[in-house]
Amino acid sequence: RASGGWYDESNMQIMAHKITPDNARLETCWGTYLFPGIGAANAVIASMEASPMKDDLKALIAETRALRAYGYYYAMDYFGNVPLFTEAKVDANDLPKTASRKEVYEFVVKEFTEAAAELPSIKEVNRTAYYPRLTKEAVYTALASVYLNAEVYAGEAHWADVVTMCDHVIGTNAYSLENKVGDCFLATNEANSTEVISSFAVDPSKGVDGNEFILYTQHALDQKKYNLSFAPANGYCFTDDALKRYEEGDERLELLEYGPQYYQDGLRYVMIKVLNSY
């Protein structure tokens, strides 16, 4: 930012595509989000599989396997070869071995495929009551995304599988585009959106916890504009050149903050003009 905010080496490395192994942002991605999530899924799966009610928990186990595969998908995409481990506990004296990107890709595809077989279709559930849990269609959509880059991950293209996964979702006739782009992101849509295939529900009464996107995408002064219970981190922003790429009347502009802004009481505050930001 022109104000000096977020002007640190980790961010600058990412913007310049010159990232070193000790980059703090990547360490956070790896050590705070991806692998703690994978580890939690391992523990939950092990607990359910050890339960005397295991046979009644097949769908829940499948759903957790899909969430774990989702974490491994991003780990594979970001880092390539990563430790592949599915046990509940890690032995500090026998750490998990690193698997090749292809091996992780094959694991992700297998887990998604087997999970989808045990999950209900969106056509089989009460959409409101089941929201926001995973359905077959949510997993098929994730698989389509994985197959899109199969040639990079495993050295072999899978374009036909991309089409097959998408056809599974489209064939339900359960989804359609919203009238406006922004309608997908309404706080009130919950299970009502016909476009959202999979979502992570966040309780607004818990503040920003679990939804860091809103924390990092808003200006600090938006706390007063929207009467927020927290102060946004003044994070992501865009350049004037990027803004000018949108034609007048483009409804996506409604999702962006630019130009003069106002507090709820009508008092104006002005966003800092950023010329060379990231």
Locate the predicted segments by residue.
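Conserved, well-structured interaction surfaces
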Residues: 4-79, 95-106, 112-126, 278
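Elongated scaffold/linker segments in the mid-to-C-terminal portions of large proteins
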Residues: 9-31, 168-278
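Hydrophobic face of amphipathic alpha-helices that form TPR/SEL1-like repeat modules
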Residues: 72, 146-147
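Short coil/linker segments at helix-helix boundaries
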Residues: 80-106, 153-160
